[in-house]
Amino acid sequence: MKRSGKIFTTAMLAVTLMMPAMGVSANEGNAAAEGNEKFRVLVDSVDQKNLKNAKQQYGVHWDFAGEGFTTDMNEKQFNALKKNKNLTVEKVPELEIATATDKPEALYNAMAASQSTPWGIKAIYNNSSITQTSGGGGINIAVLDTGVNTNHPDLRNNVEQCKDFTVGTTYTNNSCTDRQGHGTHVAGSALADGGTGNGVYGVAPDADLWAYKVLGDDGSGYADDIAAAIRHAGDQATALNTKVVINMSLGSSGESSLITNAVNYSYNKGVLIIAAAGNSGPYQGSIGYPGALVNAVAVAALENKVENGTYRVADFSSRGYSWTDGDYAIQKGDVEISAPGAAIYSTWFDGGYATISGTSMASPHAAGLAAKIWAQYPSASNVDVRGELQYRAYENDILSGYYAGYGDDFASGFGFATVQ
């Protein structure tokens, strides 16, 4: 489930009159490197004196200690710095939105608009008549995304942290404005509480929201900002002695060492990390990072269509590798579980609601379920909760969609993890 060098947000809009679909592909540095336009670089050295001098000369965006520091510079500065044999320097992946699809999903759209309870909530609760959800109390869901509308009536009661990591050096507290929509939508699927009673419910409405803005208002961002937020969530879990589920509805076609090391750091601190599998299906070996990492749970997207007695894995949902079928073991590049991700109705940045498709939408359903499970078993570890997700998925096999089949398959993973 590997792809080659791009970072993207993994949502697709179900209707064309909303914002462009989330699919962020990495700029290899071509356009950003022209003229005096600045871009992000990672600088490191075994010689601390040289590293200190470079920090003083260029300034620091984020300091990753043993991994070096990041800063912004133009092409001329970058080329000059590369000639310094005492330093190693590389470009940090830049993210930019790319439309995943502009094909209207009229049938899904009509279904979503006609239901007060999103189909994904009914599906994950395995209850077609449910109108209100519950659970997740005492658990924090850190949504690393474009920010969140913390004044949305369905979300404002859940907000505990609101931080902007795109400014660098340190985060900006009480600043996580979402002008794009993606992050607000993701947060809603995870933990919306229905607001005044006329809104939507997420999977775990009693959970607390940590809204971490790591992507800009256009849906673009840098790997170092994401890595800094991941590490901060891990540090907060330790400092506050609390349980944290990170949701990352974003991804990369190539692995970033900064993000990989940050994921490992926070996972080892007891944080459970959920990530979108990506929207490059149905092709084999297309799982994006960080979902492809062993210490992250990659979530595939299901659509509201039943075949062979189960929901169907969406064609757009990224697939793993056929040779991992049936092993019930998580390896790099595996899809782990599945959740609703096609035509998902949820909260929007303007205070209203929108319908979007993508593995970006599947991931927060799984994150909400993880929070709900953890609240039920507060003494459990992140590894325990992950095992419970796998077990529940195993109990609810997915048999529909390209490459889906009995047991652990490379389309749906272990299956569809549900509340009951």
From Swiss-Prot:
Which reaction equations make up its catalytic activity? Hydrolysis of proteins with broad specificity for peptide bonds, and a preference for a large uncharged residue in P1. Hydrolyzes peptide amides
The GO annotation for biological process reads: proteolysis; sporulation resulting in formation of a cellular spore
Q: Which GO MF terms does the UniProt record name? A: metal ion binding; serine-type endopeptidase activity
Identify the EC number(s): 3.4.21.62
Please state the span of the N-terminal signal peptide per the UniProt entry. 1-31
Gene3D superfamilies, per database record:
Peptidase S8/S53 domain
Task: Name the domain of life this protein comes from.
Answer: Bacteria
Please give the chief subcellular localization of this protein.
Answer: secreted
Domain Peptidase S8 as annotated: residue spans? 118-420
Q: Which PROSITE patterns match?
A: SUBTILASE, SUBTILASE_ASP, SUBTILASE_HIS, SUBTILASE_SER
Q: How is the cofactor bound?
A: Binds 1 Ca(2+) ion per subunit.
Active-site annotation: D145, H182, S360
* Role of this protein: Subtilisin is an extracellular alkaline serine protease, it catalyzes the hydrolysis of proteins and peptide amides.
Further information: Secretion of subtilisin is associated with onset of sporulation, and many mutations which block sporulation at early stages affect expression levels of subtilisin. However, subtilisin is not necessary for normal sporulation.
Q: What is this protein called?
A: Subtilisin
Q: Which gene encodes it?
A: sub1
